[in-house]
Amino acid sequence: MTAPIAGPEIERLIHLLARLPGLGPRSARRAALHLIRKRTELLGPLAEALQQAYNHLIPCQICGNIDTRDPCTICADAKRDPTLLVVVETVADLWALERAAALPARYHVLGGTLSPLDGVGPKDLNLQSLTERVAQGEIREVILAVNATVDGQTTAHYITDSLAAFPVKITRLAHGVPVGGELDYLDEGTLAAALRSRTNF
């Protein structure tokens, strides 16, 4: 184990930064040094923003999104189509779809996927409230935007079965060739999904 090269406060900062996705020990040291160099214009405001977020973040009681208000900004947006509901696994997935800005829908965050091997069952996810939202009658289409993994497929089938009694259309995101992708570089599963999801041209 290497000896510390800075005081415990800086070492702790580096250690915590290294726990962020995409940052290893070296990147964390560089980030820490950058923050220290920009103490007034970056480190101080960042510390304040983190404290504010820590104090005010709450889950939306309607959709499960994370925000500083309840209902969240998306659920409170009257311009969104209340008949379209996009079901996602995580808040990160919700944010990714929002960046695409393709559909002014509302969302429902499950908080993960069903995974019998990991002991994650229906009661561990935000599934009951999904059924309750659909039962209110305003939603006309449920778009399943879950990952194309075994657990994602299991979750999608469970949701489809759970909502079978309601007059809603259930759709899935198309899977296949990414924009700008070359067929030669795609795996067989992706190509098969693309062929099955083909559309008129």
Curated annotation (Swiss-Prot):
SUPFAM superfamilies to which the protein is assigned, alphabetical: Recombination protein RecR
GO biological process, one term: DNA recombination
Record keywords, A-Z: DNA damage, DNA recombination, DNA repair, Metal-binding, Zinc, Zinc-finger
Keyword Mitochondrion tagged: no
MF terms in GO: DNA binding; zinc ion binding
InterPro entries membership: DNA_Rcmb_RecR (IPR000093), Rcmb_RecR (IPR023627), Rcmb_RecR_Znf (IPR015967), TOPRIM_dom (IPR006171), TOPRIM_RecR (IPR034137)
Record has Glycosyltransferase as a keyword: no
PROSITE patterns: RECR (PS01300), TOPRIM (PS50880)
Source taxon at top rank: Bacteria
Domain annotation Toprim: ranges: 83-178
Zinc finger (C4-type): 60-75
Function (record text): May play a role in DNA repair. It seems to be involved in an RecBC-independent recombinational process of DNA repair. It may act with RecF and RecO.
Protein family (similarity comment): Belongs to the RecR family.
Protein name: Recombination protein RecR
Naturally occurring in which organism (per UniProt): Beijerinckia indica subsp. indica (strain ATCC 9039 / DSM 1715 / NCIMB 8712)
Gene symbol of the encoding locus: recR
